[in-house]
Every structure is written in C-alpha cells, then in structure tokens.
C-alpha cells in the first residue's frame, strides 16, 4: 500500500521540525524551580516563592499532592507543606507533571484521544513506571517523569497524523502494522521520535529523551549507559500495561507489542501479576486525573 508521495512527506517533515522548534518550552521560572528542587541547599520557602508566580500551577500541584495515591495524613494547603511531607524528589515530579498538563489536556483526534485522555494515559504510565522502578530498585522519581513525558510527541504530530489518518489506519488494519510504524511509513516521522526531539529542544536529561524515543521499540536503544537502557525498558513495560488496561488507549494502541526481552532484562516474569499490583492506584488516577476543572 502506498503512503503519501515523497514530496508531501518531505514537506511534512520540514513542518514537523519547524513545529518542534516553535512549541513553547516550560516557563523559565518552572525550570529554575526544578533546579532548586535538585539543590540540597535550597529551602522549601525558596521553591514556594518561585512557584507562587503562577497561581494556577500551584493549584494543580496541590491537587496532585492531595490525591489518594500519596496517602497524606491531612490535606495540605501549600507547596511548603507538600515538600515537608513528600520530600524534594517527589515534589519535583509533581511540579513537572502539573507543568506539562497544559500541553496534554486537549483532544488529540489524530490519535482518537478525547480531551483529557492523553493526560490520563501519561499520568497512569508515570505511576506504573514508578512502581516498576521501585520493584527493580531503580530511580523511582526519574521513572515517574520519564513515564509522564513519553508521549509528548503526540501534541506536535497530532495534526499531521490526522492528515494521513486514513492511510495509517489501513496499514494497521490490512497489514497488521504497528501504528507507530505506519506513522513512520506515511509521514516520515513517528510520535516517539518527535517526543525525543522535543525533550532535547527543552534541554531535559538524555534519560527522558531516550525513554520517549524508544518507548515502543526498546530493542533499538543501543550503545547507551545501562541506567538509560533500563529506564527505556521501564517506560516501555509501563506503557504496555496501561494500554492493556485500556487507559487512554487511542488509535496507536492498535497492534502494540510488549517486548518480552524488556521484561526479562527487568527480571519480571508476568505482566498479569504487574497489572494486578497496579490496578488499585490506577483506578485512583481514573477518578482524579483532571486538574483543570
């Protein structure tokens, strides 16, 4: 089956790269706050002062921190309290989640995702990735952030996927081709590659760039440090679990394949056992994922 003609593909590729460069990055004060949360000399007051510039962001942070998932003994009303009860690393993850919400809350019809579904899926993958990292004695908060950011490329590629949707879906249905491979064949790019480019543009750590770029095909992630390879595996498995559970599945969940090699590298025997472990807190995400209301 033929895709778009070569000239159209080249035009799309140029426009995708242009869109990646034009999309706004995280606000500078958020970047500064994340650095403060990495600095052992910082105080909770320093962080709170910086975040106070955006009242809406603070509200989203507190909604996440007060979710049943974290099980705090009382309802918190300030970022300072959140840091005291959850610690700098966890609050850093929450700040980043609340910051990218604005990019993910819309409808992404190219991927058959209604409003809020991309956010719900990303947050679910973040929680499952954190759980897996804990099981394999990895970096839990790094896994959470990598899971949150893994599908960011969809916000750029959505309009282009919508343009080529008919051809992409026919490749998936008629030739049993994974959706991401069909994206690549038709458009010359896929959302994982674009996500990696976006995170590189935002100057975020390579771990997050690789996790986004290879979350569908971890076997292609080669010649990288073991810590990065393991994070790619963690996010791949977390994404697969969430798709199997029907969380924000969208069109690209069609023909999705779980890498047994990734499971083996993580020393995990059964995806069914993993699903049974995460089902309770994933149901909490289903109830609490909206931050914009």
Give the role of each language-model region.
Residues 1, 17-18, 262-269:
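Charged, low-complexity surface segments at secondary-structure and domain boundaries
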Residues 263-292:
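C-terminal accessory extensions/subdomains outside the catalytic/core fold
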Residues 250, 258-265:
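A hydrophobic, small-residue-rich beta->alpha segment in the mid-to-C-terminal subdomain
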Residues 1-255, 293:
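Conserved alpha-helical "signature site"
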